[in-house]
Amino acid sequence: MGPLRLLPTAVLLLAQAAPWEASQHCGRLEYWNPDNRCCGSCLQRFGPPPCADLEFSENCGLDDAGNHVMHPFQECPPGQCNRNSAELCSLCGGGATAPIPSGSRGGTGRPCREPVPNKEPCPLTPGKSSILSSQEPSSPGIPSVSWTSEHKAPQQAWPSLSFALFLVLVLLVTSAIILLALQRHHRRLDQGKAVQHPYPSLVCSDLDTHTRFLHLSSPASLETSEARDSWKEVSLSPLLGREMPSLESQPLSRLLDELEVLEELILLLDPEPGPGGRMACGTTRHLAARYGLPAAWSTFAYSLRPSRSPLRALIEMVVAREPSASLGQLGTHLAQIGRADALQVLSKLGSSGACLA
């Protein structure tokens, strides 16, 4: 019973030690095609050796069943070289190529049955052999070099390229939606402003219109028509005419005593344009700029509302700085900022008591 127990172990050892037999049908540089039952050329299927000092393995590393049992190429034997991508190596000294065995190879041995070690710069990695085993045998007349792993690189690049294109498309669509939303929002704002002030010219009169209106009541209108752009240099008499002849000689401080007129001017000039409010051509802020006060002063004066009127503070400031300031100068500034309504209220202080039509 002892020898029988050692029989399976001996069979395994013999199977491992049994050399790989070459093709029983084809020569060394050929392989057996079991589908067509003929011998194919290793050169036509795999092409010449890709690197120097390599030659074809026996039967291209294929057995008669079409299985890849080793790599198609192997290193040259010691003392032989292959610089011209020939099928087999030759003597390094320029000798003839080693003879090529042909015909049936019934179990003949090979020069090297050990795995071929890696060699730079063209290593023969085991990963390439695993790729070879998954390929179907091709016809002898069609060369095939698809056993290299580099051919899978374009297939791996497709998913990342598709994702990048999808991301760019999403960004473009999102940007277009945002732009359309902004355009609609601006259109709605413009429509709202148009509805709120359908006739801006009626709310805020043009400066030239008031200029022509005041010039018509003056006997020297033709002479003053050439000086529309220099309001400060134009005297009060040609501008206001016979309706308010005494305003130019009255001090501005009188307005502080005429509380009724002052309150009407405050109601007209202090409010500023805003949402839902009346739009005005000129406010107390614009009037202060005509008197040469900085914008910071106007901001401070408006910050005191409603406990203190900015217009009243402006008149007190001008009277304190320039006691000789007159109502005529105030009327000129009101005409400059296009406030005919305020001019009509100011005309109540005239000796005639007439109002602008």
Swiss-Prot record:
Membrane-spanning residues: 161-181
The places in or outside the cell where this protein is found are: Cell membrane
Indicate, by first and last residue, each region the UniProt record lists as having compositional bias (Low complexity). Answer: 129-139
Its membrane topology = Single-pass membrane protein
Q: Which residues lie on this side of the membrane: Cytoplasmic?
A: 182-357
- Where mainly found? membrane
Source species, domain of life: Eukaryota
Lipoprotein found in the keyword field = no
Where is it found, in Gene Ontology cellular component terms? plasma membrane
Alphabetical list of PANTHER family matching this protein: IGF-LIKE FAMILY RECEPTOR 1
Protein name, entry field:
IGF-like family receptor 1
